[in-house]
């Protein structure tokens, strides 16, 4: 294609949000295996290296993102331990930070050695903990970084050595005081000029609300409920802070009551409305979005970053125009316009129930009572009797979306079909198959009588539909990993992260 720009074209833009970041999280079933299979084949398994991050940073520049919280799960080598990672971040002018459980740019899961260093306990093991932080600060002198203050457990747990509310408050206050003194000394800078953020995530919010003094120059980053709904934003006093505020927002999640690590189906209107709300509360310094893989989260990630760059570019009441513009950008004017209707319907259907939640089950329950900590697959709340057969209507709506998507695909230029499969067909068809699998299995259980099930044609027909839908998910996933673009995306798609029921 020929690209051109008008003579004397000029544009002057500046971002609405200063730090626009991506957190590569829960990478175990997508980004990490893909990195090992493709971009970083020469590295050891678990080392997400400069090959992966170079490709990620190229995408981030296209999205106008400028900050990274690197992948940090157990089994993933720490970002700073892999040769070339820091250098490639510097070459793209990417600011490097770390998540709510990784203060001072430290990956505690893989870098803290309890056998050698003792407990990750600031109260009882302060000298060793401070040495651990100091080492990383010295390594990052001169680097463009955003330092996370505070302390939690090794990985997403409570701070050790404190039990009462008073101990938690005093302990965390001491941590912040120590960290700031360390940053000022080791970086040789006025501490008020060092970019810092404090993230009151889960139990830390209670400590903050009990009277924790977070210095005025530190940004406060508020969190959603892990499912896309912000639970706290800056009040009038906090809005006057020099350090400003920000948000940490999930487009994927691992944890109770249930993960969603397969597809990215958060409703675009919700993303838009929540980010507009954050902006209205002057939380404009730093926005970070949690994704298990940026390719899987392509549209919502683009929406999030477009708003971070220009908050006026998208309004909640007109978010469909943004979706249409994105579809046109990816697949051309005619196809993009035709896709708006089915994709809007798709997000409505997944808004009713995420595909990952169709088993009506929960995770991380008491293993004494639940095998693997998982509740069993249950009947859904979709009724085959009430509301004009709600169950069948839900399945029929999915079939209509599939028909409309299929019609667009038939007319698509061949060179666009791989991208179409990844961004449109796989999530639509796989979500539809999950709905069929769960709801037809439910129908079979309700129709069939236990003593005559194998002679009940209606029950057997529903059971076969359920089984075939499961096979369809397997087939689609195999195509994504092994045939799409000649195997370019091998290892990126896992239909059952954490081996949860699918």
What are these regions (language model features)?
Residues 1-123, 141, 197-200, 211-228, ...:
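Feature activates predominantly on carbohydrate-active enzymes
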Residues 323-501:
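C-terminal non-catalytic alpha-helical accessory regions
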């Amino acid at each position: 294609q020929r690209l051109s720009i008008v003579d004397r074209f000029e544009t002057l833009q500046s971002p609405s949000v200063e730090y626009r970041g991506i957190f590569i999280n829960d990478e175990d079933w997508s980004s990490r295996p893909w990195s090992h299979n493709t971009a970083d084949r020469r590295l050891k398994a678990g080392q997400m290296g400069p090959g992966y991050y170079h490709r990620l940073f190229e995408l981030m520049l296209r999205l106008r993102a400028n900050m990274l919280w690197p992948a940090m799960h157990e089994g993933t080598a720490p970002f700073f331990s892999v040769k070339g990672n820091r250098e490639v971040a510097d070459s793209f002018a990417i600011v490097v930070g770390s998540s709510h459980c990784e203060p001072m740019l430290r990956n505690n899961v893989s870098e803290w050695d309890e056998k050698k260093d003792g407990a990750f306990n600031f109260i009882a093991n302060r000298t060793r903990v401070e040495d651990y932080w100091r080492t990383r600060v010295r390594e990052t002198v001169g680097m463009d970084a955003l330092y996370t203050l505070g302390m939690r457990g090794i990985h997403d747990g409570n701070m050790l050595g404190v039990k009462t509310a008073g101990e938690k408050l005093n302990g965390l206050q001491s941590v912040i005081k120590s960290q700031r003194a360390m940053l000022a000394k080791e970086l040789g800078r006025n501490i008020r000029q060092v970019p810092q953020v404090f993230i009151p995530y889960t139990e830390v919010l209670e400590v903050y609300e009990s009277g924790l003094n977070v210095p005025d120059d530190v940004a406060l980053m508020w969190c959603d409920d892990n499912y896309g709904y912000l639970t706290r934003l800056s009040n009038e006093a906090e809005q006057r802070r020099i350090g400003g505020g920000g948000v940490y927002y999930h487009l994927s999640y691992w944890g109770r009551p249930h993960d969603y690590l397969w597809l990215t189906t958060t409703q675009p209107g919700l993303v838009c409305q929540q980010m507009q709300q954050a902006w209205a509360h002057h939380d404009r310094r730093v926005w970070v979005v949690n994704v298990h893989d940026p390719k899987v989260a392509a549209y919502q990630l683009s929406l999030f970053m477009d708003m971070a760059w220009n908050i006026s570019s998208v309004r909640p009441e007109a978010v469909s125009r943004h979706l249409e513009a994105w579809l046109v950008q990816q697949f051309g004017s005619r196809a993009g316009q035709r896709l708006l209707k089915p994709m809007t319907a798709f997000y409505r259907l997944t808004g009713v129930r995420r595909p990952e939640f169709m088993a009506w089950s929960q995770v991380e329950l008491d293993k004494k009572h639940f095998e693997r900590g998982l509740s069993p697959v249950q009947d859904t709340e979709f009724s085959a009797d009430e509301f004009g057969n709600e169950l069948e209507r839900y399945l029929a709506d999915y079939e209509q979306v599939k028909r409309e998507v299929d019609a667009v695909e038939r007319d698509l230029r061949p060179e666009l079909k791989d991208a179409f499969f990844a961004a449109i067909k796989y999530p639509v068809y796989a979500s539809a198959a999950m709905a069929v699998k769960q709801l037809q299995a439910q129908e079979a259980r309700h129709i069939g009588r236990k003593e005559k099930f194998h002679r009940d044609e209606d029950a057997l027909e529903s059971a076969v539909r359920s089984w075939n839908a499961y096979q369809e998910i397997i087939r689609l996933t195999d195509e994504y990993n092994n045939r799409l673009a000649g195997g370019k995306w091998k290892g990126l798609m896992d239909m059952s992260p954490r081996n949860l029921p699918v």
